[in-house]
């Protein structure tokens, strides 16, 4: 819309002026908190993925992914990420549930502390034995009445996929 005066002779040239896009890398904690701040930079430039680790109750942070369900490309803190040509890209926090094994002394005392781990991972049953006046400790069982699976100290126990597994003292 501006007026341009042609030269008296020859050719006049106008040159395009360009400014590179400023784009963003955002972090979605997917239910967690303490995610890194957004990072901005020039289009198609490289940035370093933040090493800030978000937290989420009962979950372990396993890294970032370009797709919310984890089916995209994985990134860890310190990795190089190439920003998009325009707009915003998002990295999504990936989580593994932390599950627990608890010990119910069923009237005894001195039971082992809870053990935590990743879903479906193996833990070693504690060798700590509770005590109960007038009773002999026989071991642990997955059912309070002893009708489940028996475990002794040092045995391998597979944690559940979610929640808490409990071993009950047998007297």
Residue map of PLM features:
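Secondary-structure capping and domain/repeat boundary segments
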Residues: 1-171
């Amino acid at each position: 819309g501006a007026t341009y005066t042609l030269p008296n002779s020859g050719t006049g040239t106008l040159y395009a002026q360009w400014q590179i896009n400023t784009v963003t890398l955002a972090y979605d904690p997917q239910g967690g908190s303490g995610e890194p701040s957004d990072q901005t930079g020039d289009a198609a430039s490289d940035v370093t993925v933040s090493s800030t680790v978000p937290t989420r109750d009962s979950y372990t942070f396993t890294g970032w992914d370009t797709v919310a369900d984890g089916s995209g490309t994985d990134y860890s803190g310190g990795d190089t990420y190439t920003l998009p040509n325009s707009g915003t890209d998002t990295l999504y926090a990936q989580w593994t549930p932390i599950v627990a094994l608890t010990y119910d002394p069923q009237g005894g005392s001195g039971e082992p502390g809870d053990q935590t781990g990743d879903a479906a991972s193996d833990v070693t049953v504690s060798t700590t034995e509770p005590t109960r006046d007038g009773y002999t400790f026989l071991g642990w069982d997955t059912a309070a009445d002893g009708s489940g699976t028996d475990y002794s100290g040092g045995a391998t126990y597979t944690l559940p996929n979610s929640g808490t597994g409990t071993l009950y003292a047998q007297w």
